[in-house]
Structures are given as C-alpha cells and as structure tokens.
Curated annotation (Swiss-Prot):
Residues 39-142 are annotated as: Required for homophilic binding. Residues 35-428 are extracellular. Pfam families: ig, Ig_2, Ig_3, V-set. Residues 35-142 form the Ig-like V-type domain. Ig-like V-type domain mediates trans-homophilic cell adhesion through homodimerization and this active process is regulated by tyrosine kinase, PTPN11 and PTPN6. Ig-like C2-type and/or cytoplasmic domains mediate cis-dimer/oligomer. Disulfide bonds join 167-215, 259-299, 348-396. Belongs to the immunoglobulin superfamily. CEA family. Expressed in columnar epithelial cells of the colon (at protein level). The predominant forms expressed by T cells are those containing a long cytoplasmic domain. Expressed in granulocytes and lymphocytes. Leukocytes only express isoforms 6 and isoform 1. It comes from the Eukaryota. GO terms for molecular function: actin binding; bile acid transmembrane transporter activity; calmodulin binding; filamin binding; identical protein binding; kinase binding; protein dimerization activity; protein homodimerization activity. This is Cell adhesion molecule CEACAM1. The chain crosses the membrane at residues 429-452. Residues 452-526 are annotated as: Interaction with FLNA. It comes from Homo sapiens.
C-alpha cells in the first residue's frame, strides 16, 4: 500500500480551509456518547470550487477511517483510507486526486464538478473492531454564464405578428426570469411563458412593446442577466395632421403647410391640390398666394413596409377679409336700473365690416330669455323688464372667419326700492290703522262733548230742586219745638237723573258705565 502523506501536504488548500482545519484540530473534543455525523460546507457548491465534508463527534481510540462515494460502504467506491497509527492515507478506486483527508477524518474535495454531486459515507474503525458510519451529501451547480436572448421575429408588424423570445443557454436546475423596461413581467393576456419560462411570447405586438427585454438565469450558487434587446415594431402610418391649423389667409401671404403621420419606418408624403398631384414632400410652400389658391389641400402618407396609406384633407380660403378685427365698444342706455320697472339697451359698436357679433354674460354665452332680445345682426341687446338676476357683467365679441376680438366688460346694476312685505306691514295695512285711529279719536271727542253738555244741564236742574225744598226745610226747623214728641221725623228725598250716551271704545276688560245713575239725597228734620 502506498503512502499519501506526501501528496497530502502538497495539496493547495485556500487559507479559509487551513484556518478551519486548524480550529478543528485545536478545539475538537467531542463527547463519547454523541452520534457520528458529517456536514457539507457549503451544501450547494459552484462548479470549480471546493467543498469540505466536516466530521462531528468522532469516537476515541480508533484504528482508522475511510471515505466512500455513495450511501454505503463499497470497496470499489472507496475514495481514501487513513491509518491513525501510521498517519498514512491510502487512495481508493474512486480517488480522483482532488481529495484530501485530515487527521480529524474531514474530507476536502477541490475543483468540484457536477459529477461530484451526491452522497458520501464515512466509516470509522474503532479499537474494539466495531465500525461506525455516517453519510453526508452536497450539490454541485454550474457557474452560470451570461445569458442571451434570441427572437423569431425582430421586425414584427403592429397588430399582426407575434414574437417569441428565448433565453439561452438551456441549463439544468436553473430558474428563468424576464424583465421588460427594467420591471418584472406584468400580468397580461398577450404575454405567455413556456418551456420552463425560457420562452416569452408576445401576442399581437403593438408599438408600445418595443422593450427593452432582458432575461435572467439563477441557481442556488449564481445569477446572471442578459444584455437588453429591443423590438423594431413596424406600424402606421396613422391619420396625418396638417399644420398650421389656420384656414383663412390674406392675398399676398405665403402658404406653408407641413404634414406628419406617426409611422415606423417614417412615412412617405405627397400633396394634392383640388385632387391634382403637386409634389412628393412632407412640406408644401406656395409664396404670394391669391384667391385662386383657395381649395382642398390633401396630404397622402404611405408606409412601404406595412403597406398602409392614410390621407387628410384641409380647406384653404384666401380672402380680402381683415385678418385683425378691431376691439368693439359697448354703450348702455343706463348702467343702474330699477328691477321689475326699467328696461335697458346695450349696443355693441364696431367699425369693421363683414363681421358677426355675439354676446356674453358672466363669462357665459348669453342665455335664452323672453326678456332678452337681440336686434338684427345682434348689434343691440334689449332687456325688458330688468330683473334682479340680470345684474352682472356683459361684453360683446366681434369676429369673422379670420380673427375675433372682445369688448371691455360693462357692469349692469339692478336696484329694488320697494319694501319687502315679509319684513313688515303692507302699505294698505298701515293706511287702515291710521284711519282707524283717527276715527276712534273723533268718536271719543264727540262722546266727551255730549257728556259735558248733559252734565251741566243736570247740575242746573238739581240746583232748582234743592231751592224749592229749602222753605220746607226751614219751616220744619222753625216748627221743631211744636212737634209732638212721639211724631216721626220727616224725610225728604231728591232724585238726580243723569243720562249720557256711551261712547264707542275698544274692547276692554273693564266694565262699561251704566246709562243712568240715581243719587239719593236725604234731608232729616231736627
């Protein structure tokens, strides 16, 4: 049996492995009852790198140990054996020269390949000739190269073709991801993934699908992304537009028209005037135009790749009408009016001819109203009668097919002088109250005059009655001594009657005076 000790020390081991080995040899002191195990460091290994099969809980008092490729001890698949007494390693049939065994039974495999993927079994031979085994494993993945994207159609036609992208190369145990415009793949019914996500298909390509597109490949040990790829989507032409948008021109002006239609590749243009071909250019220029240049101008756009054609027709009118309309003026019959009483006339004045007039109220077109009338030609606006809601700003606009201009605004103020009925008594109610008060005062005055008159007459009559009874009283007085003692005293009664008309007064809680009051006056003889 040959000795492996010399090759063992000639193997180049990275400094990380040497550091790990030193630590294992220095501090390894497993408990005697622990189970023998192995650990792959790392478990997932990149192809061309190295892996260490680290042993834990190695028993004491051993004769030696051996490593085997697979999940069981098989002499034909022995990698290496190690005798502790001689500290010599002996290669087995499965040894590739890339393996290194350490005194602590750990096994280092360098420059691994995908064929190294799998299980490895350690067998330890104890001094009591009882063997103990432990199995570990690791997986070797390729170091992924930079992928690339292939396409079945790099110049698809919009709304017609489909495009299939494929991420190359095909690699086992690899994940494929796609990116569009530096974003992960969106959810869309037009995007389909197949072949383990290696193939991305775009259905019914549009001009917005130009990209860029990228594919990324990943495995547990590496990742890489392709260079971006863009699509050259052919489309168009869309309906062309002619600029500028002006329709009216003055004689003597220069006519310069430009045509544009979105298209890929760029469209080819041609011009027709009144149906007659003029030239094959994108721009059309006619100097010093006259009224004879009025007519229909047609722009024709063509895409030779898509085979599509589009046209646009624009009408040009050359006229003597003023290209600039002067600013009009508004004149008002009055600017402050009384609501529901007054009317007002607003007149829009301009020196231009061949123009039209329209009116605006509070930044809006003049509303339709039976009270608002426009004269022929819209020169005068009449409002009759003016209402509260008619207050605000008015202005007029004069325009022709070439230009327009607006007047300064004018403010219409609407006043209301009548007192609102809901805030007090109506004028009729106030007049009724005044008349009632005057009538009441007159009745009281008449009643008082009657009372004073009848009162004076009553006092005079009473005075006469008293005078007539005085002699009797006197006689009774004089004859007092002659009266018999038992004779009753004579009593004379005077009656005063006062009659007065009761005046009309408002209803009151106090009782009314009686029509007649009787006063009795008693005169006794002494």
């Amino acid at each position: 049996m040959g000795h492996l000790s010399a090759p063992l020390h000639r193997v180049r081991v990275p400094w990380q492995g040497l550091l790990l080995t030193a630590s294992l040899l220095t501090f390894w002191n497993p408990p005697t009852t622990a189970q023998l195990t192995t650990e792959s460091m790392p478990f997932n290994v990149a192809e061309g790198k190295e892996v260490l099969l680290l042993v834990h809980n190695l028993p004491q008092q051993l004769f030696g140990y051996s490593w085997y490729k697979g999940e069981r001890v098989d002499g034909n698949r022995q990698i290496v054996g190690y005798a502790i007494g001689t500290q010599q390693a002996t290669p087995g049939p499965a040894n590739s020269g890339r393996e290194t065994i350490y005194p602590n039974a750990s096994l280092l495999i360098q420059n691994v390949t995908q064929n190294d993927t799998g299980f490895y079994t350690l067998q330890v031979i104890k001094s009591d000739l009882v063997n103990e085994e432990a199995t570990g494993q690791f997986h070797v993945y390729p170091e992924l190269p930079k992928p690339s994207i292939s396409s079945n159609n790099s110049n698809p036609v919009e709304d017609k073709d489909a495009v299939a992208f494929t991420c190359e190369p095909e690699t086992q145990d690899t994940t494929y991801l796609w990116w569009i415009n530096n974003q992960s793949l969106p959810v869309s019914p037009r995007l389909q993934l197949s072949n383990g996500n290696r193939t991305l298909t775009l259905l019914s390509v549009t001009r917005n699908d130009t990209g860029p597109y990228e594919c990324e490949i990943q495995n547990p040990v590496s990742a890489n992304r392709s260079d971006p790829v863009t699509l050259n989507v052919t489309y168009g032409p869309d309906t062309p537009t002619i600029s500028p948008s002006d329709t009216y021109y003055r004689p003597g002006a220069n006519l310069s028209l430009s045509c544009y239609a979105a298209s890929n590749p760029p469209a080819q243009y041609s011009w027709l005037i009144n149906g007659t071909f003029q030239q094959s250019t994108q721009e059309l220029f006619i100097p010093n135009i006259t009224v004879n240049n009025s007519g229909s101008y047609t722009c024709h756009a063509n895409n030779s790749v898509t085979g599509c054609n589009r046209t646009t027709v624009k009408t040009i009118i050359v006229t003597e009408l003023s290209p600039v309309v002067a600013k009009p003026q508004i004149k008002a019959s009055k600017t402050t009016v009384t609501g529901d009483k007054d009317s007002v006339n607003l007149t829009c004045s301009t020196n231009d001819t061949g123009i039209s007039i329209r009116w605006f109220f509070k930044n809006q077109s003049l509303p339709s109203s039976e009270r608002m009338k426009l004269s022929q030609g819209n020169t005068t606006l009449s409002i009759n009668p003016v209402k509260r809601e008619d207050a605000g700003t008015y202005w007029c606009e004069v325009f022709n097919p070439i230009s327009k201009n607006q007047s300064d605004p004018i403010m219409l103020n609407v006043n209301y002088n009548a007192l609102p009925q809901e805030n007090g008594l109506s004028p009729g109610a106030i007049a009724g109250i005044v008349i009632g008060v005057v009538a009441l005062v007159a009745l009281i005055a008449v009643a008082l005059a009657c009372f004073l008159h009848f009162g004076k007459t009553g006092r005079a009559s009473d005075q006469r009655d008293l005078t007539e009874h005085k002699p009797s009283v006197s006689n009774h007085t004089q004859d007092h001594s002659n009266d018999p003692p038992n004779k009753m005293n004579e009593v004379t009664y005077s009656t005063l009657n006062f009659e007065a008309q009761q005046p009309t007064q408002p209803t009151s809680a106090s009782p009314s005076l009686t029509a007649t009051e009787i006063i009795y006056s008693e005169v006794k003889k002494q």
